[in-house]
């Protein structure tokens, strides 16, 4: 049963998520499963796998976020932004993607789940000009670290950070961090039910 698996995995991950938020996370999985059949939003087809590979994989980042305003670039169907918004109702998340079908899905999720702290924007990241900078710029399965920093350099506030969610870290990618940016922390993430390597890179403007 998905509800039991979610509850157990959240406990293993050391995440405090209340009953209503757990119901919202399960509802998000149900909507993703439903829309995926028509819109091909993710290559993951099984709801139980979505729970592990998408929901838990997003949520384990939560304890490391600093600030109240975040942008999730190349968010796809809203990952990691929507799961993070569900368990952080006091934080604001902008979800940015260039494909209209993904934005339509995100907006439907926001309506059905009653999420007031997300807003979806259809735009290429390099063309998006926010009125104010963000405390954190998030990316997951979006681009190389170097490309992310080059394309998103204008998005953080003065003291904002970049958060890049990565799998296995290669020397080539780590060497590709452009001048003007500094890696300040590499965090090994543990996702219950997932044997693959997961890392969170936290970077700032130098």
UniProtKB/Swiss-Prot annotation:
Subcellular location: Cytoplasm
Keyword S-adenosyl-L-methionine recorded: yes
Keywords: Cytoplasm, Methyltransferase, rRNA processing, S-adenosyl-L-methionine, Transferase
Superkingdom, taxonomy of origin: Bacteria
Main localization of the protein described in the UniProt heading: cytoplasm
Gene3D superfamilies assigned: Vaccinia Virus protein VP39
Binding-site residues, S-adenosyl-L-methionine: 74, 79, 125-126, 140
Record GO terms (molecular function): rRNA (guanine-N7-)-methyltransferase activity
InterPro entries, sorted: rRNA_ssu_MeTfrase_G (IPR003682), SAM-dependent_MTases_sf (IPR029063)
Reaction it catalyzes: guanosine(527) in 16S rRNA + S-adenosyl-L-methionine = N(7)-methylguanosine(527) in 16S rRNA + S-adenosyl-L-homocysteine
Record-linked NCBIfam families: rsmG_gidB
Annotated protein name in UniProt: Ribosomal RNA small subunit methyltransferase G
Organism from which the protein derives: Shewanella amazonensis (strain ATCC BAA-1098 / SB2B)
Lineage start: Bacteria, Pseudomonadati, Pseudomonadota, Gammaproteobacteria, Alteromonadales
């Amino acid at each position: 049963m998905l509800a039991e698996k979610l509850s157990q995995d959240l406990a293993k991950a050391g995440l405090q998520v209340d009953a209503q938020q757990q119901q919202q996370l399960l509802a998000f999985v149900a909507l993703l499963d439903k829309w995926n059949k028509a819109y091909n939003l993710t290559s993951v087809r099984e709801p139980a796998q979505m729970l592990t590979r998408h929901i838990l994989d997003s949520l384990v980042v939560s304890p490391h976020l600093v600030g109240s305003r975040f942008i999730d670039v190349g968010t796809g169907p809203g990952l990691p932004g929507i799961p993070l918004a569900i368990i952080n109702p006091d934080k604001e998340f902008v979800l940015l993607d260039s494909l209209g079908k993904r934005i339509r899905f995100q907006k439907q999720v926001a309506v059905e789940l009653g999420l007031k702290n997300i807003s979806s924007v259809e735009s290429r990241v390099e063309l998006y000009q926010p009125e104010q900078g963000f405390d954190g710029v998030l990316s997951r399965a979006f681009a190389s670290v170097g490309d992310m920093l080059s394309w998103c350099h204008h998005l953080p506030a003065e003291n904002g950070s970049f958060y890049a969610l990565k799998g296995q870290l290669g020397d080539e990618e780590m060497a590709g961090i452009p001048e003007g940016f500094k890696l300040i922390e590499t965090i090994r993430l543990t996702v219950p039910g997932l044997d693959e390597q997961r890392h969170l890179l936290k970077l700032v403007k130098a």
